[in-house]
Amino acid sequence: MCVFVQYPSEGVVMAADSDQKNIQIVGTASMNTYDVALRVGKTKQLVCNGTTGKMVWKSSNPKVATVDKKGLVKAIKPGKAMISVSGGNLIGSMTCKVGVSKKITTKQARRKIMAMKKTYKEGLSWTNENRQYFWEATNCQCYGCIALCGEISDKVFGKYAPVTKHSNFSRIKAGDHIRIGNEHSVMVLQKNGNT
């Protein structure tokens, strides 16, 4: 049996007899994700589905992100890397983009944000209707006030900081940005108890 990869994100699983004359499509191969954003020290498990045999995982830039023989990616330092998987019955390889951003403390984040007050003065219009401001992350694109929060986040946490969601108030910290009714975004400067 062999796997033929049509695109980096999806493979076609084919079965063939030993002389390669009778080939049949029997399924598809895929990875659980093709784009990962991590902070330094964090990990993400990659999985290759629909293949058999021993798979080989490799990082294009082990100084930025490593991957072990089971597909566990670890963020080492800020930058970009490509994680590829090959072997087994996979012909070719499949890849996942990894962006790593730096680890930063809440105190450092607040200090960096406050240092930007001269650049981002109060009273500037950063509404969603103002399409002049655009920002893009590895897993998000936006305009207006979200773009402002994204731009500040890039300067505080690094260009490849992940856009994540959580609903646990205790996890909110300086540097997080909060969406209010899907209409407006604010940047957290400091957390005091429940405010």
Model-identified regions with their sequence ranges:
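Secreted/periplasmic proteins that engage bacterial cell-wall peptidoglycan
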Residues: 105-192
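Extracytoplasmic soluble-region selector
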Residues: 3-103
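Generic recognition of cysteine residues
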Residues: 2, 48, 96, 140-145, ...
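Basic/aromatic-rich interaction segments and small domains that mediate binding to polyanionic partners
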Residues: 195
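Generic detection of intrinsically disordered/low-complexity segments and helix-coil linkers/edges
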Residues: 1, 28, 40, 51, ...
